[in-house]
């Protein structure tokens, strides 16, 4: 029969038996096809099983329906995996053929169409499927599937590359043939030769391009293989994790199956005991009825005893055999009872084991409470650190206010100094008014003074604006303080949430205690069941005694016959009842199977929740890894929080398992006591409890996330407070430097004003002015007398002498006027220097507050020339400090020709003057701080994971720097072009080299602009951490290049300033040859010595720069 069934199945399923041509090249295909074959075999076995009745067939259908559904589901998944793999493979082969066709259009035709099945390749491509990586199942992850598909594409491209290497030989052969053809056609026309040469050149270019593409393909293959190895390592790790999870699931399933088997055996034993009790009670009632009937019939049957005595002996022997059979059945019932007791004891042992597990869970809960208390202590420590930072901030604010008060007092002193300068200027104007010939120059001086007053008014307005800005910043500080208080309130709310978590934990402990009480009630119910069993045993013994009495009384024939008839009827009735009980047992078994399936579904949901929890924990770990570079204490706290979270999750999972086990025990006990309706109600209750636990778990996770976010906010606030403290320290140092400089400037002004007062008094006391007036009057008298006596010849020689004296006096008066003018200019220059120092200090404060370190480059020049030069010298000093801090390797803008031409200009030696010493130090410190903040912000910690926001901020700052550089380069170019338009021969070659360097700088800036745009687009689109790190490294290199460019452009700016200074000096040397100083005239110095000194002084175009001494 079995052979016939197999032959029938082969005939029915010939579509399956005849399709076993499995491929041998791909292990993945072999595994998938083997899985599909096993699924088909199981489905055929399930479908081939048959039954006698229709009800049996229906039962088999409802039993085997879920198995068939599972098999069909797995079959569908395997089919989907094969279809996706086929689609991916065809796409990869299409791409490979397109690239090969582009590289070798004459050798590799595109034959693989859209509807091909992977085998329609030409001789250039290997038709075999490549070897695959480790076996891939249809039920795996989609990431692993993509990795496997990657492996397929890599191996296929490798095969294509081999075919390309084989196909490269005919190219050279064809080239050789073409050359032979060219040799044969040498005697032909010249046009044919040129065409063939062009064709050969084009083919050689194509071959070179193809070789380059092959090299690029090899490089891409190596990269893809490296990525494949990394993905395989990740795949192996995931497989290990899956195997561990499957082993844990199998253990849990084995435990649940053992508990279900024990419960089922206990139920079966209880049902057998009940059946025996019902049988015994029915036999007792029937025996009592028979006894009454027998008593009634004894009188009637005494007459027929003699006749039926022989027959009674035979029937008595038969009855004895039947009683022996009944005794044997009773012995079997007793043995069954003993086995039921043994199983009952085993159930008690399991209950004791569960109680021990509950105790362990309680101990774990205590440990968790202790760890939570430790976490609270750590939170209090964090609060203390935050309060310390707030105190430091308040102290820094007090210091800042003190500095502001000092600045206000210095402003008052400056105002007094300005008033004194105004009074001095008025006195000087009064002294100059006495000289009649210098009125026009005095008017010019008054105009210049008016300009200065307007500039002073503008400076005062600027000071007022700055005070307004300071008030605004004070309001911002008040706002920040309010924000800090609000965050303190948030922290208190987090503490309240933590207390609610503790309350929830106490509630869970109370629930565990309630479960323990319920276990005690269950144990009492078991004791009651034991008492009932003992009572049943006693009733059985009583029934046995009564049966013995009945057997002694029923020796007669009629009684035995009636008894036998009744026994036969009872046996038939019992058989019918047994069949009904068996049907009930079947229904119970089906219900148990459905319950076990629901249990397995719940276990799978639990596993899914555990997997989600693990994914969340890994995500949290990644977030914590990003915060490693902040502080070591924070890492310790995060590690502790991790351990607490893991233990909490373990405790929660264990508590859930214990609750489920207790609920299962309850349901089993209620099974023994109640019917299936109670079991269904309990299942509904379990589902509700499971949903409530899920909700509680989600709430706890949300609260943990909130607390962690609040901790991160506190950490970020602490970092901002620390940065504010550092900025305030920098502010203090800079303000102290500026205050010292202003104090020194005030002292210098006071000393200069005192010396000027003394000079004025000396001039007033001296009689030189009186003598000059008298000489002028005498000269006028002589002139008038000369007009009256023009014809006298005897006085000619005297008049000539007087004219010479008059000319000398005029020259002296001019020298005195020029000396006064120069002195006033000197005073104005000193005033402008002080004002420029004030402006520089205030701008430094602004830059440090706003964070901009390059605003000093864009300041406009003042009204006077020396103010512009002083401002430019400050810029030069800052640029020189930046040149020293930058790398030695420049961006190589300057060409060799430019360097050789600029070497003739000489070296520049920098020596700060005493008055500007502190100013240059402050500028250098500020520039160094700004450059360090700009360049090294974010690059100090290479192990830290990269954030997208930081990369974009870095690129944005680089773009701003490039825009500033572009503006400065355009300004410098415009200056050079204006100098070239003037057509001066001074420094023409130097200006040409500077112009070439500026053009090269513009090209470099444009290249950096393009690189920055590409990096910004990549940073916005990329999501992978490794690629972001690469982008971050490229951005860091770009910032370094920008820094080098800045140093080069600053050097060019310095050279331009030097050339302008030399040019102005040459122009002045031409104009100022005819001037005579009053100082030289009064003290009798020679003009040559004074001019030499003046030329030496004017040759230096900056106060902090000196020319090198002559060797």
Curated annotation (Swiss-Prot):
One of its GO terms (cellular component) is plasma membrane. Transmembrane segments: none annotated. Residues 13-93 form the NAB domain. Residues 850-870 are annotated as: Disordered. InterPro entries: NAB, NET_actin-binding_domain. Plant-specific actin binding protein. May be part of a membrane-cytoskeletal adapter complex. The keyword Hydrolase does not apply. Belongs to the NET family. PANTHER family: PROTEIN NETWORKED 1D, PROTEIN NETWORKED 4A. One of its GO terms (molecular function) is actin binding. The lineage of its organism: Eukaryota, Viridiplantae, Streptophyta, Embryophyta, Tracheophyta. This is Protein NETWORKED 1C. Residues 202-287, 314-605, 642-752, 943-1009 form a coiled coil. Keywords: Coiled coil. The gene is NET1C. SUPFAM superfamilies: Tropomyosin. It holds the Pfam family KIP1.
């Amino acid at each position: 029969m079995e052979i016939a069934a197999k032959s029938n199945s082969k005939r029915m399923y010939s579509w399956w038996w005849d399709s076993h041509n499995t491929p041998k090249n791909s292990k993945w295909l072999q595994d998938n096809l083997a899985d599909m074959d096993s699924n088909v075999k199981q489905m055929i076995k399930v479908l081939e099983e048959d039954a006698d009745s229709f009800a049996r067939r229906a039962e088999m259908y409802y039993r085997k329906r879920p198995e068939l559904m599972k098999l069909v589901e797995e079959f569908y998944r395997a089919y989907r995996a094969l279809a996706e793999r086929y689609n991916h493979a065809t796409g990869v082969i299409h791409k490979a053929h397109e690239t090969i066709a582009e590289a070798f259009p004459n050798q590799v035709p595109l034959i693989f169409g859209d509807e091909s099945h992977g085998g329609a390749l030409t001789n250039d491509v290997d038709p075999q499927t490549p070897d695959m990586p480790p076996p891939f199942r249809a039920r795996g992850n989609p990431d692993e599937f993509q990795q496997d598909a990657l492996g397929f594409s890599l191996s296929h491209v490798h095969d294509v590359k081999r075919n390309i290497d084989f196909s490269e030989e005919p190219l050279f052969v064809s080239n050789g043939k073409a050359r032979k053809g060219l040799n044969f056609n040498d005697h032909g026309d010249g046009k044919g030769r040129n065409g063939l040469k062009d064709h050969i050149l084009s083919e050689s270019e194509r071959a070179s391009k193809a070789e380059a593409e092959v090299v690029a393909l090899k490089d891409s293959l190596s990269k893809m293989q490296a990525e494949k190895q990394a993905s395989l390592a990740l795949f192996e790790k995931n497989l290990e994790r899956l195997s561990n999870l499957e082993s844990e699931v199998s253990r849990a399933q084995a435990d649940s199956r053992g508990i279900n088997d024990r419960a089922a055996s206990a139920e079966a034993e209880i049902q057998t005991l009940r059946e025996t009790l019902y049988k015994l009670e029915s036999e007792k009632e029937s025996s009592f009825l028979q006894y009454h009937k027998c008593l009634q019939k004894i009188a009637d049957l005494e007459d027929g005893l003699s006749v039926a005595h022989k027959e009674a002996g035979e029937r008595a022997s038969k009855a004895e055999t039947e009683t022996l059979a009944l005794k044997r059945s009773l012995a079997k019932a007793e043995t069954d009872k003993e086995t039921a007791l043994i199983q009952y004891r085993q159930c008690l042992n399991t209950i004791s084991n569960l109680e021990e597990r509950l105790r362990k869970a309680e101990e774990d809960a205590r440990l968790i409470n202790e760890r939570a208390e430790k976490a609270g202590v750590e939170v209090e420590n964090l609060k203390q650190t935050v309060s310390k930072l707030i105190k430091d901030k308040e102290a820094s604010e007090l210091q800042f206010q003190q500095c502001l008060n000092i600045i206000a007092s210095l402003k008052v002193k400056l105002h007094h100094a300005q008033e004194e300068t105004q009074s001095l200027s008025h006195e000087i104007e009064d002294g100059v008014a006495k000289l009649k010939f210098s009125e026009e120059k005095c008017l010019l001086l008054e105009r210049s003074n008016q300009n200065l007053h307007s500039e002073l008014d503008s400076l005062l307005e600027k000071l007022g604006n700055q005070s307004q800005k300071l008030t605004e910043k004070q309001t911002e500080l008040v706002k920040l303080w309010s924000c800090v208080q609000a965050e303190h309130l948030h922290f208190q709310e987090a503490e309240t949430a933590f207390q609610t978590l503790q309350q929830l934990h106490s509630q869970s402990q109370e629930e565990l205690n309630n479960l323990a009480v319920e276990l005690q009630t269950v144990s009492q119910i078991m004791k009651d069941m034991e008492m009932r069993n003992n009572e049943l045993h006693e009733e059985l013994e009583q029934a046995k005694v009564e049966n013995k009495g009945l057997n002694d009384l029923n020796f007669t024939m009629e009684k035995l016959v009636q008894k036998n008839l009744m026994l036969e009827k009872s046996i038939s009735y019992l058989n019918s009842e047994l069949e009904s009980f068996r049907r009930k047992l079947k229904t119970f078994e089906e219900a148990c199977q459905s319950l076990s399936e629901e249990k397995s579904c719940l276990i799978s949901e639990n596993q899914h929740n555990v997997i989600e929890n693990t994914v969340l924990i890994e995500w949290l770990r990644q977030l914590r890894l990003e915060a490693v570079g902040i502080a070591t204490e924070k890492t310790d706290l995060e590690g502790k929080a991790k351990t607490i979270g893991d233990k909490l999750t373990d405790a929660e999972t264990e508590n859930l398992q214990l609750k489920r086990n207790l609920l299962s025990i309850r349901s089993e006990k209620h099974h023994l006591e109640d019917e299936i309706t109670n079991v269904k109600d309990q299942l509904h209750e379990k589902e509700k409890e499971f949903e409530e636990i899920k909700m509680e778990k989600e709430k706890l996770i949300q609260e943990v996330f909130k607390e962690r976010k609040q901790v991160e906010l506190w950490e970020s606030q602490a970092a901002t407070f620390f940065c504010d403290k550092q900025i305030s320290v920098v502010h203090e140092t800079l303000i102290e430097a500026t205050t010292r400089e202003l104090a020194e400037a005030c002292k210098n002004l006071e000393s200069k004003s005192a010396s000027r007062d003394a000079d004025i008094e000396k001039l007033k006391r001296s009689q030189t002015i009186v003598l000059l007036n008298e000489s002028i009057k005498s000269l006028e008298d002589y002139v008038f007398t000369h007009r009256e006596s023009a014809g006298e010849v005897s006085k000619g020689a005297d008049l000539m002498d007087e004219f010479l004296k008059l000319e000398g006096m005029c020259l002296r008066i001019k020298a005195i006027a020029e000396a006064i003018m120069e002195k006033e200019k000197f005073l104005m220059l000193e005033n402008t220097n002080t004002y420029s120092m004030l402006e520089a200090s205030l701008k430094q404060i602004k830059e440090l507050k706003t964070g901009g370190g390059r605003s000093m480059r864009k300041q406009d020049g003042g009204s006077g020339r020396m103010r512009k030069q002083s401002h430019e010298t400050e810029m030069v000093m800052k640029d020189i400090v930046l040149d020293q801090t930058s790398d030695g390797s420049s961006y190589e803008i300057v060409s060799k020709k430019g360097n050789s031409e600029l070497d003739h200009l000489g070296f520049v030696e920098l020596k700060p003057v005493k008055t500007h010493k502190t100013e240059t130090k402050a500028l250098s410190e500020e520039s160094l701080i700004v450059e360090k903040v700009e360049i090294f912000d974010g690059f100090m910690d290479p192990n830290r994971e990269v954030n997208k926001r930081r990369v974009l901020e870095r690129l944005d700052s680089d773009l701003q720097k490039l825009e500033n550089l572009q503006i400065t380069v355009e300004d410098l170019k415009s200056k050079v072009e204006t100098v070239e338009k003037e057509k001066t021969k001074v420094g023409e070659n130097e200006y040409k080299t500077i112009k070439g360097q500026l053009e090269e700088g513009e090209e470099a800036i444009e290249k950096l602009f393009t690189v920055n745009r590409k990096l910004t687009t990549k940073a916005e689109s990329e999501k992978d951490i490794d690629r972001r790190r690469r982008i971050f490294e490229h951005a860091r290199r770009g910032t370094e290049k920008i820094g080098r460019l800045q140093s080069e452009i600053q050097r060019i700016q310095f050279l331009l300033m030097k050339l302008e200074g030399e040019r102005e000096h040459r122009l002045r040397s031409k104009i100022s040859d005819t001037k005579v100083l009053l100082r030289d005239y009064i003290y009798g110095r020679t003009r040559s010595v004074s001019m030499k000194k003046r030329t030496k002084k004017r040759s230096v175009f900056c106060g902090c720069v000196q020319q090198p001494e002559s060797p």
